[in-house]
């Protein structure tokens, strides 16, 4: 029992950090702006929010924050559309953006201090089963060949605002900071119901990327914390009481209701959660839960996840967000690939003395296919082609130089080939290269007021060189592996291109 209670207190901060006064320091906002320019993701310059930083406006904001009626108008008039009741749209948007960015920097400080305060003599435990995004594809190729069932989970995130704040109370015990977080969430929810409107969620995510990422990661880590607990302690859970692994102080009443609605849930059904071969992979808003167990086991996990989201996070999630499929008869979309584990027939000729016979065996192979329809839809949305895949010109780029136009098209083409180099079939990639190359030719011909054929004849091989460099780099990722017993002598294996963090939109065009 003490072991379970200690495990459930893992994320609770033992020291109380008062981070709210940092919002009155000018260097916090300068640091937030510098992080946006030099962070891991390119800054999307859409409006004045991300491309301008005024030290004078930040000083004015700090001066106004010292005033007593700073939040009165926004709190007492929740139906107004602009922060701080500013008539000037620029000031309203600038203050809202810079304040949310500074707040996102501040609330991350307790997490950093907790990691830095770890004593040096106490070694941080290393989890060998936790891997980075770079190793996901080799992991799937190595492990999924031996599994039977897969649950494709779309992680729900429109949760209740107050529950989201309460999840952070275990890590951030600074009450003014939590009230400020409530203000931001209520400010954006008043646009049109943050709970039910996907448009409001999109606007909040677009204008407050860092804060949205922090809140979303906090929510996901909370549910993964219990998922990992169940996975590691499933053999001991039937011996414990039904409330030890889900109990929280402010959720005790919820747990009592949970016990009334589902008596003996933890004591009885958790016996079916015991599975030594279960693997969990998550990227963005999707997750994969694969195992070698039975279909009945996967249904139990699905039932548990739905009930867990309903009674712990206090919102209902649709059962259709969790799809259970058999790996041998279906494919799943993950990280921009359509992956499957089909059984391929293999004929082996066996010679024994004077008798020879054929042995028909079936082997599993992790197969990855580039989805043509989503990628063509992405290129169509970016105005490189029509919805049916017919290449068109890019009029907005005709003001650029010829070299810049070639460089942009070539970079997109190389990114596609680099990321999807692990695909077992390259036909879709060659089709995408044809679309981009002809779109580039049409764009240059439109700029010089010429036809595509005339322009191609005048430009010659220099135009094609930019679009063939990616094949050389892809082929350089292939290596020859000589096997000891091989009928063909040698064969090639797929090498996944790992530099995929910077390719934002092309990583998963479905999002």
Swiss-Prot record:
The compartments listed are: Plastid, Chloroplast
Q: Report the domain of life of the source organism.
A: Eukaryota
User: Which BP terms does GO give this entry?
Assistant: mRNA processing; RNA splicing; tRNA processing
Q: Does the keyword Zinc apply?
A: no
- A single Pfam family it belongs to is MatK_N
MF-aspect GO terms: RNA binding
- Residues spanning the signal sequence: none
- Entry keywords, A to Z: Chloroplast, mRNA processing, Plastid, RNA-binding, tRNA processing
Q: Name one GO cellular component term.
A: chloroplast
Q: Which PANTHER family match?
A: MATURASE K
What HAMAP family does the annotation carry?
MatK
State the function annotated in the UniProt record: Usually encoded in the trnK tRNA gene intron. Probably assists in splicing its own and other chloroplast group II introns.
Q: Which family does it belong to?
A: Belongs to the intron maturase 2 family. MatK subfamily.
Q: What is this protein called?
A: Maturase K
* Gene label: matK
């Amino acid at each position: 029992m003490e072991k379970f209670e200690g495990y459930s207190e893992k994320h609770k901060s033992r020291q109380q950090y008062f981070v709210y006064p940092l919002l009155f320091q000018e260097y916090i906002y300068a640091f937030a702006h510098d992080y946006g320019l030099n962070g891991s993701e390119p800054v999307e310059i859409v409006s004045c929010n991300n491309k301008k930083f005024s030290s004078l406006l930040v000083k004015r904001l700090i001066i106004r924050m010292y005033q007593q009626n700073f939040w009165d108008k926004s709190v007492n008039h929740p139906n107004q559309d602009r922060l701080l009741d500013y008539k000037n749209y620029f000031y309203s948007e600038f203050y809202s953006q810079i304040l949310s960015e500074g707040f996102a920097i501040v609330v991350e400080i307790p997490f950093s201090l907790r990691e830095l305060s770890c004593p040096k003599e106490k070694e941080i435990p290393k989890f060998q089963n936790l891997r980075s995004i770079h190793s996901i594809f080799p992991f799937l190729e190595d492990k999924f060949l031996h599994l039977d069932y897969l649950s494709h989970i779309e992680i729900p995130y429109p949760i209740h605002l107050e529950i989201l704040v309460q999840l952070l109370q275990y890590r951030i015990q600074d009450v003014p900071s939590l009230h400020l977080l409530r203000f931001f969430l209520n400010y954006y929810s008043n646009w049109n119901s943050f709970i039910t409107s996907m448009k409001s969620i999109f606007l909040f995510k677009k204008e407050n990327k860092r804060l949205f990422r922090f809140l979303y990661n906090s929510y996901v880590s909370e549910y993964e914390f219990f998922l990992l607990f169940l996975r590691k302690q499933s053999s001991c859970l039937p011996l414990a009481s039904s409330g030890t692994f889900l109990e929280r102080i402010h959720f005790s009443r919820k747990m009592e209701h949970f016990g009334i609605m589902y008596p003996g849930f933890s004591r009885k059904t958790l016996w079916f959660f015991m599975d030594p071969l279960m693997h969990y992979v998550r990227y963005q808003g999707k997750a994969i839960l694969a195992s070698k167990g039975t279909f009945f086991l996967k249904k139990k996990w699905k039932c548990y996840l739905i009930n867990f989201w309903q009674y712990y996070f206090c919102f209902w999630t649709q059962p259709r967000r969790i799809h259970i499929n058999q790996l041998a008869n279906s494919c799943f979309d993950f990280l921009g690939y359509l992956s499957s584990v089909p059984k391929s027939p293999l004929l082996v000729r066996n010679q024994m003395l004077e008798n020879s016979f054929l042995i028909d065996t079936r082997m599993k192979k992790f197969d990855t296919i580039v989805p043509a329809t989503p990628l063509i839809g992405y290129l169509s949305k970016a105005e490189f082609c029509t919805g049916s895949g017919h290449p068109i010109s890019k009029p907005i780029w005709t003001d650029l130089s010829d070299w810049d136009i070639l460089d942009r098209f070539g970079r997109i083409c190389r990114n596609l080939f680099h990321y999807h180099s692990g695909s077992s079939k390259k036909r879709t990639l060659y089709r995408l290269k044809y679309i981009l190359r002809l779109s580039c030719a049409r764009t240059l011909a439109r700029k010089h007021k010429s036809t595509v054929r005339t322009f191609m004849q005048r430009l010659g091989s220099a135009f094609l060189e930019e679009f063939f460099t990616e094949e050389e780099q892809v082929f350089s990722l292939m290596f020859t592996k000589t096997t000891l017993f091989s009928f063909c002598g040698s064969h090639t294996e797929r090498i996944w291109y790992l530099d995929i963090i910077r390719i934002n939109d092309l990583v998963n065009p479905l999002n």
